[in-house]
Amino acid sequence: MTRHLIFAAVLLVCLFVCWNAIGAQDARSAFSSEETAQDQHVMEERIFINPAGNREKNACLENCRSSPNCKNYEFCSK
C-alpha cells in the first residue's frame, strides 16, 4: 500500500513538472510572437518616418491597417 502511495506521489510530481514546463514554453512562445509584432511595427515606423512621396504614405497606411498592434496612423501623416 505504501509503495502505491509513493508511486502515485512521484507520478503526480512528474506530471506537475511536465505541465509547468509546457506552460512555460507556451508563455515564451507568446512573448516571442508579441515581441516580433512590436519589432515589425517599429520597422514600419522607421521606414516611413521621412516619406518621400504620396505612394510611400499610402503604403504606410496599408501596413499600419494590416498590423494588429497599430493603434493610430500618426507617424504616417508626417
Swiss-Prot record:
Gene Ontology MF term list: toxin activity
Residues annotated as signal peptide: 1-24
The keyword Lipid metabolism is annotated on this UniProt entry: no
Domain of life from the UniProt record: Eukaryota
Coiled-coil region list: none
Tissue specificity field: Expressed by the venom gland.
Localization terms from the record: Secreted
rRNA processing is among the record's keywords: no
GO cellular component: extracellular region
Prosegment location in residue numbers: 25-28
Keywords: Disulfide bond, Secreted, Signal, Toxin
Post-translational modification comment from the UniProt entry: Contains 2 disulfide bonds.
UniProt family annotation: Belongs to the scoloptoxin-04 family.
Protein name: U-scoloptoxin(04)-Er1a
Lineage: Eukaryota, Metazoa, Ecdysozoa, Arthropoda, Myriapoda
